[in-house]
Curated annotation (Swiss-Prot):
It comes from Salmonella arizonae (strain ATCC BAA-731 / CDC346-86 / RSK2980). Its main location: membrane. HAMAP family: TatA_E, TatE. This is Probable Sec-independent protein translocase protein TatE. PANTHER family: SEC-INDEPENDENT PROTEIN TRANSLOCASE PROTEIN TATA, SEC-INDEPENDENT PROTEIN TRANSLOCASE PROTEIN TATE. Belongs to the TatA/E family. TatE subfamily. GO terms for cellular component: TAT protein transport complex. It holds the Pfam family TatA_B_E. Disulfide bonds: none annotated. The keyword Cell cycle does not apply. One of its GO terms (molecular function) is protein transmembrane transporter activity. The chain crosses the membrane at residues 4-21. The keyword Transmembrane helix applies. Part of the twin-arginine translocation (Tat) system that transports large folded proteins containing a characteristic twin-arginine motif in their signal peptide across membranes. TatE shares overlapping functions with TatA.
Length: 67
């Protein structure tokens, strides 16, 4: 009863297509793809910024202990 079979998935997919239509689903898929690309680009840009901060940071002076 709780199993998900291929026929159940096909029925759900057919209902989604009937409810939203193919044009709306195509638009939704394009928007989702654009959002994912933007997210990945932002993550890569953030990583590059962090690396620049680490590499280009000011080094601390070495202190010697005087007795």
């Amino acid at each position: 009863m709780g199993e998900i079979s291929i026929t159940k998935l096909l029925v759900v997919a057919a209902l989604v297509v009937l409810l939203f239509g193919t044009k709306k689903l195509r638009t939704l898929g394009g928007d989702l793809g654009t959002a994912i690309k933007g997210f990945k680009k932002a993550m890569n840009d953030e990583d590059v910024g962090v690396k620049k901060d680490v590499d280009g940071g000011v080094q601390a002076e070495k202190l010697s202990h005087k007795e």
